[in-house]
């Protein structure tokens, strides 16, 4: 059995994620209260405005303990939370270029440096290979705080490499989508990633391997029009906003007010766009069970 050592403690793949130390996250033990205290930094829930300690919200997988609102997770934190054990990170050799010498209110390279400084990531997609409930798989997650999780050439490169590795090692690929769409600063090159990622997904299907998409808040544009809607199974987190054009753009076009829950996960479930809505606390076991069924694993 594979084991990993963190903070001087030996952990097996079956160790509950609440007992593991996630890089960059201070994990609370079960005795710690989920209520805010005066001695710890707090986060205000955007839904119920409750103040929750950073320790408590991390312990609760970034779900508000007061109202159950699903807060946004950073890509790296999500993948480390998702896997029992991370074996490798993929795609770090890819780095963004500026072939168009694109300048809007500031040069593209400057925007990239700002995004890297803000998130600590080199690009908007993080890819890891690991095990979940003793099943090896590959998972990728979009970092929405990196230029809105936009898809450029490096995101395409990393996704395609993840799919190719999954085919090579006969493993499932999981994608946690959270994106505003294609990256305008790369023009047609970013739009080409829609075709590249779609072709990579088709190769996975030809190989008989599962591709599962978890739609988190929000998913829009070219990512929705490609890799986010080509899964064998589509899972959404509660209340996630999912669409192609944004709600305001549609309202301005059709000159009508679109009432809630338009474009919410619940609306899409009612209209057959997603297969199920899964609470974040049940997500790991749900994905593990689906992968095991689709791959005929015990």
Curated annotation (Swiss-Prot):
Swiss-Prot/TrEMBL keywords: ATP-binding, Cytoplasm, Fatty acid biosynthesis, Fatty acid metabolism, Lipid biosynthesis, Lipid metabolism, Metal-binding, Nucleotide-binding, Transferase, Zinc, Zinc-finger
Gene Ontology CC annotations of this record: acetate CoA-transferase complex
Reported cofactor(s): Zn(2+)
An example molecular function term from Gene Ontology annotations: acetyl-CoA carboxylase activity
Co-factor binding details: Binds 1 zinc ion per subunit.
Subcellular location: Cytoplasm
Chain sites annotated for binding Zn(2+): 45, 48, 64, 67
Residue span, CoA carboxyltransferase N-terminal domain: 41-298
EC top class named in words: transferase
Keyword Nuclease: no
EC number per UniProt: 2.1.3.15
Annotated catalysed reactions: N(6)-carboxybiotinyl-L-lysyl-[protein] + acetyl-CoA = N(6)-biotinyl-L-lysyl-[protein] + malonyl-CoA
Pathway: Lipid metabolism; malonyl-CoA biosynthesis; malonyl-CoA from acetyl-CoA: step 1/1
Primary residence: cytoplasm
ZnF endpoints (C4-type): 45-67
Cysteine-cysteine disulfides: none
UniProt keyword annotation of Aminoacyl-tRNA synthetase present: no
Gene Ontology BP terms: fatty acid biosynthetic process; malonyl-CoA biosynthetic process
Quaternary structure note: Acetyl-CoA carboxylase is a heterohexamer composed of biotin carboxyl carrier protein (AccB), biotin carboxylase (AccC) and two subunits each of ACCase subunit alpha (AccA) and ACCase subunit beta (AccD).
Recorded family membership: Belongs to the AccD/PCCB family.
Entry-linked PANTHER family: ACETYL-COENZYME A CARBOXYLASE CARBOXYL TRANSFERASE SUBUNIT BETA, CHLOROPLASTIC
Functional description taken from the UniProt entry: Component of the acetyl coenzyme A carboxylase (ACC) complex. Biotin carboxylase (BC) catalyzes the carboxylation of biotin on its carrier protein (BCCP) and then the CO(2) group is transferred by the transcarboxylase to acetyl-CoA to form malonyl-CoA.
Name this protein carries in UniProt: Acetyl-coenzyme A carboxylase carboxyl transferase subunit beta
Source organism (scientific name): Acinetobacter baylyi (strain ATCC 33305 / BD413 / ADP1)
């Amino acid at each position: 059995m594979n084991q990993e050592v963190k903070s001087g403690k030996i952990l097996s793949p079956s160790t509950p994620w609440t007992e593991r130390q996630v890089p960059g996250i201070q994990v609370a033990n079960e005795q710690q209260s989920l209520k805010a205290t005066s001695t710890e930094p707090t986060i205000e829930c955007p839904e119920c405005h409750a103040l929750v300690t950073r320790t408590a919200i991390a312990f609760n997988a970034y779900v508000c303990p007061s109202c159950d609102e699903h807060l946004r997770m950073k890509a790296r934190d999500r993948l480390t939370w998702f896997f029992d054990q991370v074996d490798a990170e993929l795609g770090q050799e890819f780095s963004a270029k500026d072939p168009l010498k694109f300048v809007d209110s500031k040069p593209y390279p400057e925007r990239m440096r700002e995004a890297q400084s803000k998130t600590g990531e080199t690009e908007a997609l993080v890819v890891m290979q690991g095990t979940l409930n003793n099943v090896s798989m590959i998972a990728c997650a979009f970092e929405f705080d990196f230029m809105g999780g936009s898809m450029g050439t490096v995101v395409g490169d990393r996704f395609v490499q993840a799919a190719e590795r999954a085919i090579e090692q006969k493993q499932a690929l999981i994608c946690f989508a959270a994106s505003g769409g294609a990256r305008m600063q790369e023009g047609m090159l970013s739009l080409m990633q829609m075709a590249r990622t779609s072709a990579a997904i088709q190769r996975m299907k030809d190989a008989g391997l599962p591709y599962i998409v978890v739609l988190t808040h929000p998913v829009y544009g070219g990512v929705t029009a490609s890799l986010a809607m080509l899964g064998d199974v589509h899972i959404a987190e509660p209340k996630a906003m999912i669409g192609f054009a944004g709600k305001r753009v549609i309202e301005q076009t059709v000159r009508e007010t679109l009432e809630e829950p338009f474009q919410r996960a619940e609306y899409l479930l009612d209209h057959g766009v997603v297969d199920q809505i899964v609470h974040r606390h049940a997500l790991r076991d749900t994905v593990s069970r689906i992968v095991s069924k689709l791959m005929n694993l015990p």
